[in-house]
Amino acid sequence: MKITHLTTAILLALTLSACSSDDENTSTQPPVNPEEPTVPDPEPETPEQPVPVPEVYLDENFDQMTEIPATWSMPRSNAGTVYLSEGSLFLDGRANDTQMTSVMLPQEYQKLRNYRIDMEFAYVERNNGGRWGSIIYRAADHYAEPAFSPYYQFAIRGDATGASGLELALRQPTNAWNVLHKSAYKENIDPTKTYKATVIVHGKRVRHYINDELVLDTSLPYSLDQGGIGLSTAGLLMRVEQLKITEQLDALPESNKVTDIIDHRLPVSMAPTLAQPAPLTGNASVNATHIAYQLDEQLNLLNANNQKVMHLRDYLNDSNRRTLPLLTVKNENTITQLKALSTNYDLTDFTFVSDQADLLRKVRLALPSSRTALDYSRHTGLTHSRKDIVQIAHNTNSSLSKIVILPSHLVKQEVVSHLQRLLITPWASTNTTTPVSAAQILTTGVNGILTTQPDTFQNLMKSMAPNTLLRKPLITGHRGIPALDDENTLESMLKAIEVGADAVEYDVYITKDGHVVLMHDDTTTRTTGVARKIEEMTLAEVRELRTLGKQRQIPTMDEVLTEVTKYPHVVNFIEIKSPKPEIVPAIKALLDQHDAYDQSIVISFSGAQILHMKNVLPGVSTGFLTNTPTAQSDIVNTRRILDATQQYSSTFNPSFGGLSKELMTLASQRGVTFWPWTFRLNKEDFNRMYVQGTHGLTTDYAHDSSNLIVKLKTPAEITATVGKPVEISGQTTTQVGEKTTYIFKEMLVLPQSAKYTQAGQAVTFSEKGTAYVMPRYNYTMAPNYSYTLYAAPVKVTIQ
């Protein structure tokens, strides 16, 4: 069997597009800290260096395999049989509970050392619950005595919940086992289910997973300079439905933790990150989680006056540090020095900053696990136009970043929300010292703020109500709206939009004649009743299908884009289900055709497809679909999340189970955004995660959110009378867009305002003068679940 290769390509820059804003801007306040242009406006970045895409050595589903290849080996000591049947590989080890039945892959895999093995399997029958199946890796060749020993194996017992349910074991040349690690899985292996077991090994580091959930992370005691791969059973019949072997390019991190930053426990849900430039004198504020430095070629940390503060190595060695660094990198020599330093130090929990997208891309390629932020704070020529917003998103993604630091004049709610819909994490940069300007910035919903005055922002947020939402959680219609119409149909997408969804998610495959079509499963059986593989059909054949529910046609992505682009505020969440790399350029062609880059992002469970995206569609955001890590510590789980998101320069899109407020808060301080799925009848989980400020929620029931109040509109200025409670006439807007006149009687009075008294939430000024207030609105979703919105500051002239 030949080892196949995924090809990589660098294509031309994306055709930029954009859209008009759907958010109204009624503020008459002056712009926050306008700055003079100091650098030229950015051009769309065309990446010079491709992201390395791992080679796929084997991807076999056994459908077309009629006999076991001659290059595959069966050990002579096999107790049972290995055979093919009904499109699957079977290892029947029931003949003996302890003597193995194994199959070894071709000898050519011996030359490999660093790889990922994914096996989809089921235990059809077992002699007892203690029997097991396994993945063999780092095995010797058939010339060894005994053959193929020594090797490591990931063994999974039928009764996987036992203390030895999962094992990492070393098979020794003496035919004895050395069990290196034991652990229990959360459930026993159900004979009616198919599971996925994964081994990722690089150097002496290894990770084991079941169904993409990490179950072991350790270092191997012996490197075993060999690469053999195989499968094995003892005392059970194992069916293997899919076997995939992929090159592992990146080393697995040695550290399992991140910096333990201070949790200020603010009442604001998922409060924005506060970062502070390194002060010229004295210490940084304890309210800042990040400190910004310049980084020179000798890896010295410099303040804004280019004065040395300390060496990066000293910063890393400070065990009492509770802050994270923002390090501005200016040239490739610095990257070379960072690469050398990374052999002894873990730089995963650092953020490297530059205003050059190509330089940041080089940082990420040199340090694949690092985090980067594109600094456009001085690009004052950019506008809030559709074209410029897409350009910002494009260049942020091309730089392999998720964070972009905006120029002050673009720190507007309509710009911020558009970038967030495109899975970009926008930060503000400001030198403001006034509470009014700080309040203006906070109500834009930015994810982070780089400021010389973090205390001003922190104190303001401390005075807000519990579960304050400064940024609206986005509602994504899962496959449209399956609760009301058939999934992955055009009608379902349009219905989701009708009830107020911010985005529509749909799954795509590519037909054998090259058309991108919507389908969740790789077969059409479940949704249409016709037992065909979607990628073995032509478009004409797909056109003949009808859904079982409402007899809907299976749409093409072309048809969906045609309709969705009529709603500029709605985003296409395009989930790549196909394993075929050719679907990515096909998606690019459709986005080009419809000029839909301002409304489109791509998500996938496949890391290979996401990396392929970085070369073919480098300007389009990606989301990595996965599960929430399950370690007992939020510090460790945050590290797991960073390992996933920073590797793929993607958002974190997990199944919502196990996703806690504390974990999301800790990871969001590092620029991670959360897009959990799928909420159905579990309304309490949805309500909980909404009031916690989750960035986006994917649901089958988008219509349940239609009446949520999501926006407040108030005048920029009013007059009030001394001694009378202040009332402000304004407007509320629901998720579906319904506007209602509302009299605001509750408000937050900002510091430096005229004297006032407060009875309950009613505010009465006791002297003439000027004040600034933030009108507030509290909405109750259900018992025990409510949130508070604040409007932008209103100037009050008291007479």
Stretches found by the model and what they are:
Residues Y115, K193-Y195, V570, G769-V773:
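Exposed beta-strand face motif in extracellular beta-rich ectodomains
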Residues P44-I262, V353:
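Extracellular glycan-recognition regions
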Residues L252-E332, A373-K472, T476-R479, L625-T721:
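C-terminal active-site rim and adjoining tail of enzyme catalytic domains
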Residues Q356, I441, Q453, H478, ...:
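Conserved, mostly hydrophobic/aromatic
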Residues A9-L58, L214-V215:
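Bacterial Sec-dependent N-terminal signal peptides
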Residues N256-D388, N397-V411, Q420-L422, D513, ...:
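Metal-dependent phosphodiesterase/phospholipase catalytic core, i.e.
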Residues V710-Q799:
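Extracytoplasmic soluble-region selector
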